[in-house]
């Protein structure tokens, strides 16, 4: 068994690594190749390109990397032609992945989409590509299968969000927790995102908010959680520059950490976070949070033509209500960040109102096992279609068609349907 997996973002790299481990329980001798990051490689995948290093967002940034994306499409196509993998698994990252799916289908290779892109929120027309190029959609959100089914995609199943697998298995640093607990002052966790562009755009507002909040609530502590050391250096530079520009109070200290996101979320009384899967962790910890996503003014103008969802936060989408106050804007949001934090730190009733829906939602959706369920669905699909391909009454090509096409093929072979004229 040989499986090609592609993930283009840090969160996708994490989900791919967990899926590889789950697939190994089904296929112990399987080989994994693809595009991804360090976590995929650590799980045993052979990387054809470190796609996670190219994580980009919004229109112009994609355009500037267009040559690289085109080259990767040809790299994938050559791999499909020469190595003939048994399956292709794609994780989020629309755009490039539609082209990879197209090339895989052209080579007769089944395509699975794990943690599909949120096309229901901003690009509903792309469901046509799902119908055409994807054999099974492994949905991470409970309302997604119904959305796909209503648009003619019958091969969509809910497996759960793989982020909960990571939360269930991830140990916390007990000495770090103990040392932090001994310190005075409530902690505000600052989570500026996993992409360099996100950190650059969102962290300045968060630092300005920290300066404003520290004037209102002396003694409050702040800590920035970074994905890796490169982001830590960038974040430290932004913190230093922004504090100097804002004439921050001399007692204000903003510490910057790498690899301490779960610990800081566990310790914090409030969080300021960039929109993304980290919101699910904030939900699990029932931590009152404000969600921010800063984009350029032009990008926001273009996005408003496409965005169909009411919310940008996964938690708000799951609740279908504003559980986390959220701000998608090009404007300075530091006043709003400081205002909500001040409310939750000083008003216990307001804090309780913020945590109650999080606890309820956690019980409803925070179920681990998504990676195992996805692996089981992939294995079952491949087994069923391998048997169908081996049956003497069916052609091999029928194994890689949609359900409607396979039914029609059976009818033709049984004499129930006349062949079309040519």
Predicted regions and their residues:
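Nucleotide-activated sugar donor-binding and catalytic core shared by glycosyltransferases
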Residues: 1-422
């Amino acid at each position: 068994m040989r499986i090609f997996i592609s993930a283009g973002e840090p969160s996708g790299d994490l989900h791919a690594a967990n899926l590889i481990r789950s697939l190994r329980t089904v296929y112990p001798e399987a080989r994994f190749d693809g595009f991804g990051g360090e976590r995929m490689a650590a799980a045993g995948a052979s990387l054809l390109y470190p796609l996670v290093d190219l994580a980009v967002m919004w229109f112009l940034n994609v355009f500037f990397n267009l040559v690289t994306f085109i080259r990767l499409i040809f790299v994938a196509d050559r791999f499909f032609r020469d190595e003939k993998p048994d399956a292709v698994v794609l994780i989020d990252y629309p755009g490039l992945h539609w082209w990879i799916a197209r090339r895989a289908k052209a080579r007769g290779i089944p395509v699975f989409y794990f943690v599909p892109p949120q096309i229901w929120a901003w690009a509903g027309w792309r469901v046509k590509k799902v119908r055409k190029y994807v054999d099974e959609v492994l949905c991470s959100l409970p309302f997604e299968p119904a959305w796909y089914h209503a648009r003619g995609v019958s091969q969509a199943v809910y497996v759960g969000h793989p982020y909960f697998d990571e939360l269930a298995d991830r140990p916390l640093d007990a000495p770090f927790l103990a040392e932090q607990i001994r310190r005075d002052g409530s902690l505000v966790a600052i989570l500026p995102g996993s992409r360099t562009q996100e950190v650059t755009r969102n962290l300045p507002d968060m630092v300005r908010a920290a300066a404003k909040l520290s004037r209102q609530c002396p003694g409050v502590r702040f800590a920035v959680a970074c994905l890796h050391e490169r982001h830590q250096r960038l974040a430290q530079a932004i913190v230093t520059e922004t504090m100097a520009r804002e004439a921050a109070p001399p007692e204000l200290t903003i510490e910057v950490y790498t690899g301490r996101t779960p610990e800081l979320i566990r310790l914090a009384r409030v969080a300021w976070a960039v929109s993304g899967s980290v919101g699910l962790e904030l939900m699990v910890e029932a931590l009152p949070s404000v969600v921010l996503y800063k984009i350029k003014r032009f990008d926001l103008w273009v996005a408003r033509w496409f965005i169909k969802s009411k919310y940008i936060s996964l938690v708000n989408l799951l609740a279908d209500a504003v559980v986390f106050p959220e701000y998608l804007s090009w404007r300075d949001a530091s006043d709003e960040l400081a205002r909500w934090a001040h409310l939750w730190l000083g008003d216990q009733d307001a804090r309780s109102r913020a945590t109650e829906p999080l606890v309820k939602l956690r019980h409803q959706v925070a179920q681990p096992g998504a990676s195992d369920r996805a692996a089981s669905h992939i294995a079952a699909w491949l087994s069923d279609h391998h048997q169908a391909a081996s049956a003497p009454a069916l052609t091999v090509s029928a194994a890689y068609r949609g359900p409607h096409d396979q039914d029609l093929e059976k009818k033709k072979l049984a004499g129930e349907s006349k062949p079309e004229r040519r």
